[in-house]
Amino acid sequence: MGLYLNPNADAFMQNRNKKIYVDKSQIIYELNDLIDSDDNFVCLSRPRRFGKSMAGNMISAYYSKGCDTREVFSLMKLGQEPCFDKYLNKFNVIKLDLNGWYQRAIQRNRKDLLLTDIHETLVDEFKVAFPALSFCSGETLDQCILKVYSETGEKFVIIIDEYDVLIRE
């Protein structure tokens, strides 16, 4: 379990434990229908302050192998669905908040290294998560993902929050 590869459910649990929380877990029911389909690339775009980050945290907590969230989701609306646990904690998840990465790059006055920093961090997490496989810093992220998939058959869910920060800023 890493910070970005197979993250835990802490961010989602913080959202879930807020005084005001709206259960939007049924979106996962809809997403589950898209897994292994031609429509498996999804973009959740809504106005600001609409809960996209919370949805990303929830989606990560549901799919990530880095946590066990059966008890949490069984008590939510999704838990009422017959196959709510079909994909529960079954995928390698990469979850990135590009705004956080961007802000750190700005603080260091190194926007030019933003993608390099993300890449190096993820390759380091791949090395820890999959010690039986060898990864080198020259490999691209897609090469790392394909290596894991070809060697283990394990699939990935990739969640990118604040994906528009590079265009917006």
Protein language model regions, located:
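Phosphate-binding site recognition
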Residues: M1-E169
